[in-house]
Amino acid sequence: MEGGAYGAGKAGGAFDPYTLVRQPHTILRVVSWVFSIVVFGSIVNEGYLNNPEEEEEFCIYNRNPNACSYGVTVGVLAFLTCLVYLALDVYFPQISSVKDRKKAVLSDIGVSAFWAFFWFVGFCFLANQWQVSKPKDNPLNEGTDAARAAIAFSFFSIFTWAGQAVLAFQRYQIGADSALFSQDYMDPSQDSSMPYAPYVEPSAGSDPTGMGGTYQHPANAFDAEPQGYQSQGY
């Protein structure tokens, strides 16, 4: 993983798609995006059955409309979430503020863990309703492959989203690279708590400017000895 602030280099560099697609969290987002399409696509296309004796369609999962609605809703929202965070992955290296990067990574941790939990609930819900479904409701076994696919990819999505949360936490642990970023640095000349320039101890040598060296009196300033009285000739 790249050095820098929260797993990305210094802001302002050129966009590198090759580096983007090689990042583990970006790969997992794409995989999660595909899985979400499989889940809600399978339910929308083949998750509702027609019975000649009934006017309305019913959900293939034990005739429970909540099961189909849950799978479609979670799949669509997860699909949109993947798109949002894929866009964030593209924009993330351009974020110059360390605090903004921190917020983005923390949101990634929370959202990824949230979706891992909801996919776990969805897998358990769909699997349970499929298990208790009555064969007489679907004597021709229509849509059974799609129903099983939705359950399977709900299960796989648990791990892809949990993996995103783990990778985001690792990026959070990296933190800010002090060599490239500093969020607490203040220019001493702009620091109001330091009104005066710091004292610099003068050097022992001569000071050609006369500003900081030690004072040296002239060599003959006080060395002249008093001379005796000399009479004046008149």
Swiss-Prot record:
Q: Name one Pfam family in it.
A: MARVEL
InterPro entries hit by this protein: Marvel (IPR008253), Synaptogyrin (IPR016579)
Please tell me one Gene Ontology term that the record gives under cellular component.
Answer: melanosome
By its UniProt entry, which PROSITE patterns does this protein fall under? MARVEL
Main location group: membrane
User: Superkingdom, according to UniProt?
Assistant: Eukaryota
Against PANTHER family, the record matches this protein to: SYNAPTOGYRIN, SYNAPTOGYRIN-1
Protein family according to the UniProt entry:
Belongs to the synaptogyrin family.
In its UniProt entry, what is this protein called? Synaptogyrin-1
- What organism does this protein naturally occur in? Rattus norvegicus
The coding gene here is Syngr1
